[in-house]
């Protein structure tokens, strides 16, 4: 985000957007399962070291295009950005009612159907038309 704000309308939220990037917010399912079993919050399943893989940020608006995720070159997920459930301004407006948004915030906005496990040694790439890919090889 280029600017921050709270309690925003969708129009106000859209004006905060600096640019777009491909990204992958990884989840450690082992930590998630442990936390759920213990009836504890599972934030750390999403917030562990190196859990947010992000490509280069391209300033400006993003045209509709494809988003895809490949694992070792095989397509696992693929959809049009226009098929995502919530438009980005709606997501930002909703978030701004829960927490203040700040300049520099990166917001991951969802994924197409097909989420699945990744294993050590696999290379996962998230690619969005018009953006640099976000790639990670799991150690």
PLM regions: where:
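Catalytic-core "active-site belt" of small-molecule-metabolizing enzymes
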Residues: 1-102, 106, 114-139
